[in-house]
């Protein structure tokens, strides 16, 4: 019976780990699981947005610094994937829970809200700090606009050709 109780306790602990924020997670930073949060880190005069993964102690039991996944060199969705994969590996997360989290990419607006909250807490994070967070969205928007601009130019060429032909036809009929 004691073994059964320990197994049930371990399962409850695991379910809480993969379905709720850690109780010590500060407001606006939680992503719905223990050990994975949204953050801004000060680096000199800059504020760097990142997903942060809590790490297990090293082999000697010493705490390790969180691993930060920033948006400087990769798009938002890829950074989320990398952070979730590392979190799952670091904390021995089951495949189904890892996959569930991979499909729930938080909106970049999370970082806008976090920036506001942290500024209310006394920080001074400029809006420019969000630039790398929204880069993927800006690139996608630019990609959808480019074909529309090409189509618009082609339609204008067709319209101009039609107007020239129509004017020529009118002039010759007169």
Model-derived regions: residue spans:
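Short, well-structured beta-strand
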Residues: 47-64
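Basic K/R-rich, polyanion-interacting modules in nucleoproteins and related proteins
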Residues: 1-51, 104-174
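Long, charged/polar, surface-exposed segments that mediate recognition or autoinhibition
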Residues: 10, 73-75, 79, 87-90
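Short loop/beta submotifs within extracellular cysteine-rich repeat domains
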Residues: 59-61, 91-95
